[in-house]
């Protein structure tokens, strides 16, 4: 038996399956850790030596359903429960007609 090319054809067991956190096929079944996101660790796996991978899945590459709204509210100091002042142009146009 050789340990090279000819023995690779005999492999038939799955080492990795889908990760429930990142969805990639990098969850090692025997180690029970994900090679891409580090699940089940609480902190997401991220390294500076792979700048391109950081660029692929950082904040802002997805929908940001909640953060989009937070950024907008931050610009005005998280004001709540106030009504906007009526615009002068709208008031003048309605009074002239």
Swiss-Prot record:
Residue numbers bearing the Phosphoserine modification: 96-97
Entry keyword Metal-binding: yes
Top-level division of the source organism's lineage: Eukaryota
Subcellular location: Cytoplasm
One record GO biological process: translation at postsynapse
Keywords: Acetylation, Cytoplasm, Metal-binding, Phosphoprotein, Ribonucleoprotein, Ribosomal protein, RNA-binding, rRNA-binding, Zinc, Zinc-finger
Keyword set includes NAD: no
Entry GO CC: cytoplasm; cytosol; cytosolic large ribosomal subunit; postsynapse; presynapse; ribosome; synapse
Positions annotated as zinc finger (C4-type): 19-37
One Pfam entry name: Ribosomal_L37e
Residues recorded with modification N6-acetyllysine: 10
Residues that hold Zn(2+) according to the record: 19, 22, 34, 37
Similarity annotation: Belongs to the eukaryotic ribosomal protein eL37 family.
UniProt subunit comment: Component of the large ribosomal subunit.
Job of this protein: Component of the large ribosomal subunit. The ribosome is a large ribonucleoprotein complex responsible for the synthesis of proteins in the cell.
The name this protein goes by in its record: Large ribosomal subunit protein eL37
Gene (UniProt): Rpl37
């Amino acid at each position: 038996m050789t340990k090279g090319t000819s023995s690779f054809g005999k492999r038939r067991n799955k080492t990795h399956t889908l990760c429930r956190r990142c969805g990639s096929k990098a969850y090692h079944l025997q180690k029970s850790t994900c090679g891409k996101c580090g699940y089940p660790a609480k902190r997401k796996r991220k390294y500076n030596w792979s700048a391109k991978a950081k660029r692929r899945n950082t904040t802002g590459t997805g929908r940001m359903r909640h953060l989009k709204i937070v950024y907008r509210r931050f610009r005005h100091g998280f004001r709540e429960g106030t009504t906007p002042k009526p615009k002068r142009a709208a008031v003048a146009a309605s009074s002239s007609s």
